[in-house]
Structures are given as structure tokens and as C-alpha cells.
UniProtKB/Swiss-Prot annotation:
Organism of provenance: Clavibacter michiganensis subsp. michiganensis (strain NCPPB 382)
Name listed for the protein in its UniProt record: Na(+)/H(+) antiporter NhaA 2
Membrane topology (UniProt): Multi-pass membrane protein
Transmembrane intervals: 10-30, 60-80, 89-109, 118-138, 148-168, 171-191, 203-223, 224-244, 257-277, 283-303, 328-348, 356-376
Keyword Membrane annotated: yes
An example molecular function term from Gene Ontology annotations: sodium:proton antiporter activity
Length: 409
């Protein structure tokens, strides 16, 4: 069961199902009651935490997802596809293009509206969803496509984490921040002490790590920095192999519980009974910037990166059709974009709801466009592979020289 939930296809399917169910239920007669329940608060006075149920998911449970993202980032930088400048160059430039162009598209559409603060929303790529769509529709494509998408999404996540840390930190409490930093350092020390431990000693180390992680989360939340940054810092703090083991253990919970719950709670939005002309500019900015901005930005960045790489004597990246396909997958914002919308439009409930709908619409357009393109590319790749296999079989079965001489290749 856990191996099934780890599947990229299943993870993407659960995310999509949860979002659809949340959106549908929110617009039924049960919707108002469910929305009121989701916005109800659950307080822990002893530690000074008072969050709505939505925020317990986005500020609490989602930390697990960001911990796993940080572990994957660290692995890619130390031993994966980003462990050298030459390997990281093209996806890095493509990732920058995939952030800058959507932000510019959004700002161009919302200029003068007072809603420019939402520019980070269309800059994110949902790594789990994008890889899931690729796994479903991209069979037979070169392995380099998945490697490039993974590197691109990892770098995109790194930029998104930086945006959250820099632009969504308010009222910094230096005392709480000091506790959070101390917690991360202690987490790193305990993590290294746990290397090679077995039995009761290993259980004790894991229990201590969980306790330190909870304290670090509380201190980060109290400091004014978004709590998901705690997950990022803790993920980077663990030794690489220990982090990979921890991420592997947490992945079923993240894919099967955390991400679907977040998608469900974020999609609990009542569709406004207004005309298209009455929608806020932020809606159009996000809905267009995700599929269109990402397509243009990643493609242009990838082509620029390939040119720079060739000038340096390195490999030039993907073929243009595959780069366009990856660019469409990059337009699937979903998880991180939904979080960005929640943060950017805090206090503007109507705009936040429209932002959520725009993320769902823009990501949906990107999913459909990517699925169609992947299906076409995949069909051609499988056909080319079958033709090559037939050609090889013909050469083996019918040598050019029947007299025992060498067959001609």
C-alpha cells in the first residue's frame, strides 16, 4: 500500500481528486457550513498558538512536505543532477526564466490595481503533480526529460522557498528566531549522532529529533517567518543519507494525507456569482501567467541556457520539443501556488478565493496542454523505438552475407 502511495501517478491523482472534491463540496448546500468549520480556530494556549483549521494544514502539516522537498534539494546538489555547474546550468537558467516571466505577466495585467503583491503566486511549479503527469502521459520519452524536469522543479522550489522567507515574513521576533536557529543546529547534531545507531538507541534518537523538530516549528511560527521554512531548514540540516531515509518514511504520509488535505482545504472556495468582467485583475494575472508565462519563460530560459552551455563546451540541454513539453509541465502551480495565494492575499478574502480559482484554472490548462503534448511526443517516441527494434531484428535475422562473411551494419 505504501509503495502505491509513493507512486508519482497516484500522488498526482490524489491531489487532483482532493482539489476537485473540495471545490465541488464548497459549492453545494453543505458548503457554507464546511467553510465556517474550516475557518474555525483551534488554539493551544499553553504554547501561544491559535490557528484556523486551514492554517493548521498550511502552517503545520505542510511542513512535512517542505522537509521532503529540502531533503531532495540537498541530495540533488550533493549527489544528483545538480552536483556540478555544468549539469545545473541549463535547468537553473530555465528555472529563473520560469519565475521572472510569469511574474512580469502578472504585474503587467495587475498594474495599478493595488494587487501587485500577488506576483509570486504564478512563479511556483508543483514538483509532485508535474512528475505525476509526466509519469502518466510521458511513457517512452527520453530519461533526460524527467531528469531536466526534476532539476527545474527542484530549483524552482528553492526560489519559491526564498520568496516565502523574504517576502512573507512579518513582525520578526528575534528571540523566537534565535530559538528556531538553535533548534536547527541541535537537530543537525542529533541527526549526526544517530548515524549507524540501531535498536533502542535509534528509537531514542528519532524521538529526540521529533521533539526538536516540533520546538523548531513552534519557534519559527512564533518568530513571524512562515512555518514551512522550519521544514526546509530541518531537511537541509540532516546528513544526506539520513535525510533520504527520513523522507522515504514520511513520503506516504505526505502524498496520502498532507498534500490531499492541503489541496482539499485550499480548494474550499465558493465560486462567486459574478460575471467574468467583475473578476479581480489578480484572477486573470494568475490564470494567464501560470500556463503562458511558464511556457514562454522556461522555453526562453532553456534556450538561453543551452546557448550558454554550448559556449562553455557543455551539453546543450533538451531538444526544443521536449523543452516545450517541460515548460508546459512547469505551469502546474498547484500546491506551492495555492500557498502563495493564501499568503499574498491575506486579509483580502474575496481576492484570495479568486486567486485560488485562478491557480486551479491555470494549472488545469497547463495539465491538459501538457497531457496532450506528452501523449503526442510519447506516441512518436514509442513508434521510433519500435522501428529501431524492428530494424535491429532485421539486421540480426537477415545478414547481408549468407556465406559467413560479416553482416553489414
Amino acid at each position: 500500500m505504501t509503495s502505491l502511495i509513493r507512486s508519482e501517478r497516484v500522488a498526482a491523482g490524489l491531489l487532483l481528486l482532493a482539489a476537485v472534491v473540495g471545490l465541488v463540496v464548497a459549492n453545494t448546500p453543505a458548503g457554507p457550513g464546511l467553510l465556517a468549520w474550516a475557518d474555525g480556530h483551534l488554539a493551544l494556549p499553553a504554547i501561544g498558538v491559535d490557528l484556523s483549521l486551514r492554517h493548521w494544514v498550511s502552517d503545520g502539516l505542510l511542513v512535512v512536505f517542505f522537509f521532503i522537498v529540502a531533503v531532495e534539494l540537498k541530495h540533488e546538489f550533493l549527489a544528483g543532477g545538480l552536483n556540478s555547474v555544468s549539469r545545473a546550468l541549463v535547468p537553473a537558467i530555465a528555472a529563473v526564466g520560469g519565475v521572472v516571466v510569469p511574474a512580469l505577466v502578472y504585474l503587467a495585467i495587475t498594474a495599478g490595481s493595488g494587487l501587485e503583491r500577488g506576483w509570486p503566486v504564478p512563479t511556483a511549479t508543483d514538483i509532485a503533480f508535474a512528475l505525476g503527469v509526466l509519469a502518466v502521459f510521458g511513457r517512452g520519452l527520453p530519461a533526460a526529460v524527467r531528469v531536466f524536469l526534476l532539476a527545474l522543479a527542484v530549483l524552482d522550489d528553492l526560489i519559491a522557498i526564498g520568496i516565502i522567507a523574504v517576502f512573507f515574513t512579518t513582525g520578526l521576533d528575534l528571540g523566537a528566531l534565535a530559538i528556531a536557529v538553535a533548534g536547527v543546529v541541535l537537530f543537525a547534531v542529533v541527526g549526526r549522532l544517530g548515524v549507524g545507531r540501531t535498536g533502542a538507541a535509534r528509537i531514542a534518537v528519532v524521538a529526540l529529533l521529533v521533539l526538536v523538530a516540533l520546538v523548531t516549528w513552534w519557534a519559527t511560527l512564533s518568530s513571524g517567518i512562515h512555518a514551512t521554512i522550519a521544514g526546509v531548514a530541518l531537511g537541509f540540516a540532516l546528513p544526506r543519507l539520513s535525510g533520504l531515509r527520513a523522507a522515504h518514511a514520511l513520503e506516504p504520509a505526505s502524498n496520502g494525507i498532507v498534500l490531499p488535505l492541503f489541496a482539499f482545504s485550499a480548494a474550499l472556495v465558493a465560486i462567486p456569482a459574478i460575471g467574468l468582467a467583475e473578476l479581480a485583475p489578480a484572477f486573470w494575472g494568475i490564470a494567464l501567467a501560470l500556463p503562458l508565462g511558464k511556457l514562454v519563460g522556461i522555453t526562453a530560459g532553456g534556450l538561453l541556457g543551452a546557448w550558454v552551455a554550448r559556449r562553455r563546451g557543455s551539453a546543450g540541454g533538451l531538444a526544443v520539443p521536449d523543452l516545450v513539453t517541460v515548460s508546459l509541465l512547469g505551469g502546474i502551480g498547484f500546491t506551492v501556488s495555492l500557498l502563495m495565494s493564501e499568503l499574498a492575499f491575506a486579509g483580502l478574502d474575496d481576492v484570495r478565493d479568486e486567486g485560488t480559482l485562478a491557480v486551479l484554472l491555470g494549472s488545469g490548462v497547463a495539465i491538459v496542454a501538457a497531457a496532450v503534448t506528452l501523449s503526442i511526443r510519447s506516441r512518436r517516441a514509442r513508434r521510433a523505438g519500435a522501428a529501431a527494434d524492428d530494424d535491429d531484428a532485421t539486421r540480426d535475422d537477415f545478414p547481408a552475407h549468407a556465406d559467413g562473411g560479416p553482416a553489414r551494419a
